[in-house]
């Protein structure tokens, strides 16, 4: 089991917008991710999640798990490389323990962040597999 400490910070929306903060953190030079809470039942969400300077990038190439690891603590995960994507992703998540720095954090802070490309749906929905070739399923 690999334990990672996640860090978070609450900021007042009076001084920064999520987009301005995201741009200042990434400076258009490093990859980053901005997730915004959705409007539900007429109420705006409370959280914006910004992730940047990733320790690891997980990709799906030809329906197989591909890892780009930038942190030596995660080196043992490299053995998952080449596994069928969903099996590899499950194994990866079982080997990680994400610990938050404050129990008052937003519920989503102890998580892995990212996205799945449209074609990756075929890996989750077998009925779509005939319509979308595995070689197109990348995330």
What are these regions (language model features)?
Residues 1-139:
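Signature of the chorismate-utilizing enzyme
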């Amino acid at each position: 089991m690999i334990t990672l400490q996640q860090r978070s910070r609450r900021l007042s929306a009076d001084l920064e917008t999520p987009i301005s903060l995201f741009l200042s953190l990434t400076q258009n030079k490093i990859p980053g991710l901005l997730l915004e809470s959705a409007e539900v039942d007429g109420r705006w969400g409370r959280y914006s999640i910004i992730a940047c300077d990733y320790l690891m990038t997980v990709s799906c190439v030809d329906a197989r798990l591909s890892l780009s690891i930038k942190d030596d603590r995660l080196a043992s995960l490299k053995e998952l490389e080449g596994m069928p994507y969903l099996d590899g992703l499950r194994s990866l998540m079982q080997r990680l323990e994400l610990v938050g720095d404050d129990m008052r954090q937003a519920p989503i802070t102890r998580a892995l962040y990212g996205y799945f490309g449209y074609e990756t749906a075929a890996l989750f929905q077998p009925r779509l597999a005939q319509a979308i070739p595995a070689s197109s399923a990348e995330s």
